[in-house]
């Protein structure tokens, strides 16, 4: 009976070990003058994710959000948050692991990062900022497609060069 159990594949395991703020910054380079003007901001959100293996089956995932609000030509505020998590992930295929690190984990981290950004903006006495949900699955699929297209292009160039 023990031999049968050892031969079966291990069930996938996913555990959140820790969620934490890795880095945080809020700047209002044109204050207090920016508070005297009519508030018609243009808000830009940039986000990035990265992951690193810490130990066997243990990974750190970092979600970086940069929110820039411009009022006319002037920067009203710049908010940067790096929300991180340590995740124990086991029993997944390489493709499933890549999806977990590139989409599932950032999806877990985003509400924490969104709350941090909202809190910083409020402390800067700016109007409430609600960041829309992000479809990390779609972003990850786009990233995979771009990598595949790049690999195919590189293979075609190599084939042309050897011909």
From Swiss-Prot:
GO terms for biological process: protein folding; protein tetramerization; protein transport. HAMAP family: SecB. Transmembrane segments: none annotated. Homotetramer, a dimer of dimers. One homotetramer interacts with 1 SecA dimer. InterPro entries: SecB, SecB-like_sf. It comes from Shewanella woodyi (strain ATCC 51908 / MS32). NCBIfam families: PRK05751.1-4, secB. GO terms for cellular component: cytoplasm. The gene is secB. This is Protein-export protein SecB. Gene3D superfamilies: SecB-like. It is found in: Cytoplasm. Pfam families: SecB. GO terms for molecular function: unfolded protein binding. The keyword Cell membrane does not apply. One of the proteins required for the normal export of preproteins out of the cell cytoplasm. It is a molecular chaperone that binds to a subset of precursor proteins, maintaining them in a translocation-competent state. It also specifically binds to its receptor SecA. It comes from the Bacteria. Keywords: Chaperone, Cytoplasm, Protein transport, Translocation, Transport. Belongs to the SecB family.
